[in-house]
């Protein structure tokens, strides 16, 4: 089970869909892959992804800034970039705190 490893994988999600909904293992894997693919495509297009009761994957633009090489102390420009952040919903945060 995923809790034994500490990491939930695609295979674990597919197996849960198979057990809970009763789809074949192949169909369950296809459903999981399609959901993840749609999420990835939306993010690649610059869209945020919000899953009610779970959380939001939010794209943010970071501007150029000056960083510093920790070994030499030399200032180095860091190019602007797009970063992905995740914000858990209040419902998910409450479930994590309560442990169920």
From Swiss-Prot:
Q: Signal peptide: which range, if any? A: none
Among the Pfam families in the record, one is Bac_DNA_binding
GO BP annotations listed: DNA recombination; positive regulation of metabolic process; regulation of DNA-templated transcription; regulation of translation
UniProt keyword terms in alphabetical order = DNA recombination, DNA-binding, Transcription, Transcription regulation, Translation regulation
Q: DNA-binding among the record's keywords?
A: yes
Recorded hits in PROSITE patterns, A to Z, give: HISTONE_LIKE
Q: Which InterPro entries match?
A: Hist_DNA-bd, Histone-like_DNA-bd_CS, IHF-like_DNA-bd_dom_sf, IHF_alpha
Q: Please, which domain of life does this record's source organism belong to?
A: Bacteria
* Known function: This protein is one of the two subunits of integration host factor, a specific DNA-binding protein that functions in genetic recombination as well as in transcriptional and translational control.
Identify its protein family: Belongs to the bacterial histone-like protein family.
This protein is called: Integration host factor subunit alpha
Provenance organism: Rhizorhabdus wittichii (strain DSM 6014 / CCUG 31198 / JCM 15750 / NBRC 105917 / EY 4224 / RW1) (Sphingomonas wittichii)
- Gene name? ihfA
């Amino acid at each position: 089970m995923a809790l034994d490893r500490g990491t939930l994988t695609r295979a674990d999600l597919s197996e849960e869909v198979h057990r809970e909904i009763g789809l074949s293992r192949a169909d369950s894997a296809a459903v999981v892959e399609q959901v993840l693919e749609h999420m990835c495509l939306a993010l690649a297009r610059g869209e945020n992804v919000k899953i009610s009761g779970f959380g939001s994957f939010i794209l943010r633009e970071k501007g150029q800034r000056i960083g510093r090489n920790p070994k030499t102390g030399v200032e180095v420009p860091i190019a602007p970039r797009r970063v992905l952040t995740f914000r858990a919903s209040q419902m998910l945060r409450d479930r994590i705190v309560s442990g169920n």
